Amino acid sequence: MKSCILLCGGMSRRMGRDKGSMKIHNKPMIIHILEALNNQIDELVIVLNDDNRIRKYKKIITQKNYSFKIYFTIDIENDLGPLCGIMTGLEKINSDYALVLPCDSPYIDSDFVYYMFDTLESILENEDNESLMALVPYHRSPNDVDIIKRAEPLHSIYHKSYIPLIDEFLQNNIRKVRVLMKNQNCLYIPIDNHLINVNNFKNLNRPTDIEE
């Protein structure tokens, strides 16, 4: 089973309004992402911050349009950032791994989704990699130094065994997502326009980003 977690529980302070429902090219951002996921995954867990937003997104999304099951869930704790959203989603999935995506990246394409899961499957065929915790894209640089700083943690695949670790991080007021990559069995895959288009990682955070 291929699972995906879509993080829609952010406060959107820089944008000034809920991002996932904002229209770009005549469609809500979240619809662009769901179309990229279609025929690529089996289930999608959408993490939101309250019942009102769940009702709002249920009006935007109709289950019959997609090949995968859609589940809506409320973030375990509001305003703790994407790290808490990842934990919430991992607790709901019916598989061991999930691709985590943000709701403000409308240029995610199906090739990226396919590549991530295909790479994961190839890795897991090797018994030596059964303990893999995360599959993380990163931007290349000379000598590939400081990979963690150039990684894309919100476009990555995580194992649900992260749940107790994330809970511990949050209990200690550690909220940065990049902490998931430290001292863990993570595999980094380089972002290359021939395999992974860099547009997949473009976030729309401010009104001016949409106007560009």
Task: Give each language-model segment a name.
Residues 203:
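PAPS-dependent sulfotransferase catalytic core
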Residues 1-154, 160-200:
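Nucleotide and nucleotide-moiety/phosphate-recognizing core
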Residues 1-3, 207-212:
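SAM-dependent methyltransferases
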Residues 159, 206:
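Short, conserved phosphate/pyrophosphate- and ester-handling motifs at nucleotide-, phospho-/glycolipid
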